[in-house]
């Protein structure tokens, strides 16, 4: 597998970033996620998980803004992780018109609800804040195509899996993708709750 079958805006971004060849992990994972199946992806740091998440999200959304409701929801540990992922996304979306927004505890919930209402394609946020926004009717998930968890190791020692499950069980047809350095007890719990058919890819 190469990057040849990706959308032109993604290939242009990869070229500008001087990324020519996928990692062995990306060769396995990118086509698997593109196929639409639920995936739990386990690999060490440096395998290319974040880039894979970004590429597949843009690919799934066809690289274009569409209507007002979010089509991808990405769960992260905290504000710092959200902003870092947004920065990486910006490197890959510069040839698209996709709209990205971050939601976390250190900002007013009304501002976040208002911004989401005006129209975004990708929302990056913490489970706690997104759960609160959702149950205040501040985000419409009827058009959601992907629910992703970046670096799911952060779930250990928290109750976030409960908040994630609340969102997941409210969705209709949606692809779930989880990235992690390790296969943990909380990922196993997510499998029991709503990822029973997910393919586990471990490198």
Residue ranges and their predicted role:
Residues 32, 63-68, 93-95, 114-118, ...:
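Conserved catalytic network of the ASCE P-loop NTPase/AAA+ motor domain
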Residues 141-203:
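Post-DEXD/H (motif II) to motif III coupling segment of the RecA-like Helicase ATP-binding lobe
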Residues 27-39, 49-67, 90:
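Walker A/P-loop NTP-binding motif
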Residues 43-47:
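The conserved Walker
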Residues 39, 72, 100, 146, ...:
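Hydrophobic/aliphatic anchor position in the core parallel beta-sheet
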Residues 126-140:
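Conserved RecA-like ASCE ATPase "motif II neighborhood" in helicase/translocase motors
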Residues 67-129, 144:
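Conserved nucleic-acid-binding Ia/Ib motif block in the N-terminal RecA-like helicase ATPase lobe
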Residues 1-42:
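Conserved pre-motif I regulatory segment
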């Amino acid at each position: 597998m190469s990057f040849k079958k990706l959308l032109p805006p993604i290939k242009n971004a990869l070229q500008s970033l001087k990324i020519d060849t996928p990692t062995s992990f990306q060769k396995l994972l990118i086509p698997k996620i593109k196929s639409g199946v639920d995936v739990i992806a386990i690999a060490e740091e440096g395998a290319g998980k974040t880039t894979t998440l970004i590429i597949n999200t843009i690919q799934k959304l066809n690289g274009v803004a569409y209507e007002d409701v979010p089509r991808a929801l990405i769960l992260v540990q905290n504000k710092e992780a959200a902003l870092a992922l947004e920065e990486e996304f910006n490197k890959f979306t510069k040839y698209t018109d996709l709209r990205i927004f971050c939601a976390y505890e250190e900002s007013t919930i009304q501002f976040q609800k208002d911004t989401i209402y005006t129209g975004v394609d990708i929302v990056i946020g913490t489970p706690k804040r997104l759960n609160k926004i959702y149950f205040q009717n501040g985000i419409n998930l009827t058009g959601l195509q992907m629910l992703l968890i970046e670096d799911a190791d952060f779930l250990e020692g928290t109750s976030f899996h409960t908040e994630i499950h609340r969102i997941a069980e409210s969705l209709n047809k949606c692809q779930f993708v989880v990235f992690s350095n390790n296969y943990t007890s909380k990922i196993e719990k997510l499998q029991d709750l709503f990822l029973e058919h997910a393919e586990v890819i471990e490198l």
